A protein has these predicted regions:
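Acceptor/aglycone-binding surface of glycosyltransferases and processive sugar-polymer synthases
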Residues: 59-60, 66, 72-76, 80, ...
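Short, well-formed alpha-helical segments that are part of the catalytic scaffolds
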Residues: 15-31, 47
């Protein structure tokens, strides 16, 4: 895959550990040499000294005193960046995804055929034993099965915070995308399935960071997000018409 097309990385953040995020920005800048690293930063006022630390690390920052939500932050930022950059990559701001995996994911887009490249969490064995709780494993497995059954998403890890796409793919998906929160990932994939967007799936070396927890209320909330994603996808016209009796499925063209 060519790597000479403009790349923008987006790290949506809400009250992140500034030291860890600054180090992550520096690592991504060194490893990927992107044209832009942007942090839509919720819960902070303009002029806060923390913003300067992120800028010194190599990022541009758009602060918001309110919590607009992950989906709103990503959609708004992609809308701006997709007019100037050919490739878009988003990663969780806590640095859970390794920079090496981010390099591989970014290399999957920018070719002759526009595509969406998604990661699935692949923790190092020791890190998985240490950091990934039984609750998180059960939740992830159950959510994946529900996403498959309700929305037609066959991906290993729909909620993985590592996804890359061509800017042209973003503009195809954007009109139907409405989710402003953590269900943004699932709605994105559901719309991609309905539209027939080619998708590739790749392992991402992942270490869960302290403070990223699964609330007991999440399964009920996520079910609502899945049903919303299904409704949104049903309104998305496919690239090629399919029989009305046929359920749209996320077409994973390649798996690592």
């Amino acid at each position: 895959m060519p790597d000479d097309r403009d790349l923008a990385i987006v790290l949506p953040a809400y009250r992140p550990p500034i030291g860890r995020l600054s180090e992550y920005i520096e690592t991504l800048d060194t490893q990927l040499d992107p044209d832009r690293i942007h942090v839509p930063f919720d819960g902070i006022k303009d002029g806060d000294p923390q913003l300067r630390r992120l800028e010194q690390a190599g990022a541009t920052v758009s602060p918001s005193p309110d919590r607009q939500g992950k989906g709103a932050a990503l959609s708004g930022t992609f809308d701006r960046l997709a007019t100037s950059f050919d490739r878009l990559l988003f990663l969780d701001a806590d640095g859970s995804a390794s920079a090496e995996s981010a390099v591989h994911l970014a290399e999957q887009v920018g070719g002759s055929s526009p595509t969406l490249a998604i990661g699935y969490r692949h923790p190092p064995q020791q890190a998985e034993r240490r950091n990934r709780t039984g609750c998180r494993r059960v939740f992830s497995s159950g959510y994946r099965r529900l996403a498959h059954a309700l929305v037609g998403i066959d991906a290993r890890d729909p909620q993985c915070g590592a996804k890359a796409m061509d800017a042209s793919v973003w503009w195809q998906l954007r009109p139907a995308l409405r989710n402003t929160g953590f269900g943004w990932d699932t709605e994105l994939l559901a719309i991609a399935a309905a539209a027939g967007i080619p998708v590739s799936e790749h392992p991402v070396e992942w270490v869960d960071q302290p403070g990223t927890t699964v609330r007991l209320t999440d399964p009920v909330w996520m079910l609502g997000q899945l049903l919303s994603a299904r409704r949104r996808a049903s309104k998305t016209p496919p690239r090629q018409p399919t029989p009305s009796s046929q359920t749209s499925r996320l077409r994973v063209a390649n798996r690592d």
